[in-house]
Amino acid sequence: EKEYGSAEVMKKDDLMYAAFYSRSAAYSKNPKTPGGFFFDLETMKPLINNPGFVEALTDWVEATKYVPPGGINFGLGDEIGSFGGGQTLFSFSWDDAFVAAMQPDSPINNKVGAAQLPGAMKVWNRKTNSWDEGFNQAPFFVWGWAVGVAKKSKEKEMAFDYLCFFANEANHQ
């Protein structure tokens, strides 16, 4: 079977927005312009129509050349199966694809690794309305599936206990 470059969630209304935001963060989340990613926090003006998001969309369209047949209609399950089944070299997704690739019946079992999302060689600066050149990596956790305790927290143990309580499945019955 022919192999392809990338498996991504591209199907409309099936987490496509999440994949797009993950791709666009490196181009549009500038460390020199703190504050909102989706909206300007002072004006609440949407930021999605800035050149950083447009550049990400341009990249995404380019990536469609390297997906398997039908890949532009991949939902999350399709993306996981494509990568885990050894059809694609790269999965731009959550860890589910990695887990699928590590299954005993996967042709790529024990032949894969995981890394942060790629960065970009420029990032849009909405304060100067220009590109800042240089590498920018701004991983974006869709759905907020990450928690942590601030290094400077005065109540680290209490904060950690709080997180453990809400992460316990028994507390969600």
Regions found by a protein language model. Give the residues of each.
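Extracytoplasmic/periplasmic substrate-recognition and gating elements
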Residues: 65, 104-173
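Short secondary-structure boundary segments
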Residues: 10, 95-96
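Glycine-centered hinge/linker elements that transmit conformational signals in sensory
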Residues: 19, 32-73, 116-122
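Pocket-flanking alpha-helical
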Residues: 1-2, 78-81, 97-105
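Paired acidic/hydrophobic, glycine-rich loop segments that form the ligand-binding mouth/hinge
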Residues: 89-94, 113-114
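Extracytoplasmic/periplasmic solute-binding protein
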Residues: 1-45, 88
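Stable alpha-helical elements in mature extracytoplasmic
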Residues: 16, 20-23, 53-60, 79, ...
